[in-house]
């Protein structure tokens, strides 16, 4: 159930990514794949995103793009292979996957004002620990609370 929920969440993140990038970046998916140039420290984000853009970007647009690209990165991190090797949800690896998802949702909300979490909570509820009385939705809400408390 967890993988299905995260796949649905990734779909929503990707949808917002395309909406934000449409008409502003030459090739949004190629830019996403080349984002490693920023992550590795090879390039600074403002210069890099301007290279990807089909228009001259202002500071506010650059900030939105920075958050959206970080959300895309977190959406990829949700699928780290270590999250799927263990039998129980109540381990650090699946929790990290859910935390990455929550952080991506928070970044999307910061960038666009859209809350893409509403449809995902019921999906996350279906992913339950068999050892503890917790669900992936519990982890998600905790992570969102941390984002709102410490990052807002």
Predicted feature locations:
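Catalytic cores of glycan-processing enzymes that make or break glycosidic bonds
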Residues: 1-152
């Amino acid at each position: 159930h967890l993988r299905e929920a995260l796949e649905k969440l990734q779909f929503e993140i990707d949808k917002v990514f395309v909406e934000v990038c449409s008409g502003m970046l030459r090739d949004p998916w190629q830019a996403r794949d080349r984002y490693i140039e920023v992550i590795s420290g090879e390039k600074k984000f403002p210069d890099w995103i301007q290279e990807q853009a089909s228009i001259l970007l202002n500071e506010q647009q650059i900030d939105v793009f920075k958050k959206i690209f970080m959300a895309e990165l977190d959406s990829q991190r949700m699928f780290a292979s270590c999250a799927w090797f263990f039998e129980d949800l109540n381990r650090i690896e699946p929790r990290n996957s859910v935390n990455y998802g929550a952080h991506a949702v928070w970044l999307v909300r910061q960038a666009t004002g859209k809350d893409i979490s509403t449809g995902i909570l019921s999906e996350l509820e279906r992913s339950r620990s068999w050892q503890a009385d917790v669900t992936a939705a519990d982890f998600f809400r905790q992570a969102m609370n941390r984002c709102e408390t410490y990052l807002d």
